[in-house]
Amino acid sequence: MSKNNSKSTQGAPLDYIPGITTINQPVFMDDSVLTMNPTMNVPTTNTLISPIPVTTSKSSQLDSAHPTVVHIGDNHPEPKNESKTQPKIESKKEPTLKQEEQTIQAEEEAQKIAKEETRESFLRYGGEIIIDIMLGILLGIAVNMLTDYIASIFGLKGTAKFPIQLVLIVIVLYMLRINPDISFPLRSRTDTYGVIFIPIFITAQRNFAIFFSELYNIF
């Protein structure tokens, strides 16, 4: 410790601060700087030529002797990657010739498939209708034969055969509706019973004609 540090703060020099060592540097003044105060007759300084004395504390001296290393990852946040936050701008690619050709080919294939399906459905349903008509004719012939056989057993003639024939037609249609696989395995629809009934009616028109003619003669 120096003598200046052992003394009290009273009477200490102006550049003395407790706990701080000072570096004494000479202060040079210009004669023009000194001016006399007319009231107090004390010279005052307006401008200092030399710099202000530099004071250094013990802590700053220790810090300068042992510089600290600052790691970016310890206390300082990492800089944000701007590329992550920025939205990706997707460039719209114009369709190439290959893509256009592929779309055209797909549309053509879809049209071909639709045409084939309509053709197959038309042939299938058309074939079903033709088969229904043929089946109706065969069933009409069978109904006529069965009606004549029943009428011959009971000795019925003329208009008496009509109710028997009508009952047989209803029974045949009912059987086809309940289990169409027994009588007609190829049937896949149930909306062509009218097509079946018309051939039966036409085939069995002989008994219907007799019935309506006798009914007309009665009235």
Swiss-Prot record:
Could you tell me the superkingdom of the organism this chain comes from?
A: Viruses
The membrane-topology field of this record reads: Multi-pass membrane protein
**Gene Ontology cellular component annotations, sorted alphabetically:** membrane
Renumbered to this chain, region (Disordered) spans 70-102
Principal location: membrane
Q: Which residues form a coiled coil?
A: 96-120
Enumerate the UniProt keywords alphabetically: Coiled coil, Membrane, Transmembrane, Transmembrane helix
Biased composition range(s): Basic and acidic residues: 73-101
Q: Where are the transmembrane segments?
A: 126-146, 153-173, 192-212
Q: Which protein is depicted?
A: Uncharacterized protein L631
Q: Which organism is it from?
A: Acanthamoeba polyphaga mimivirus
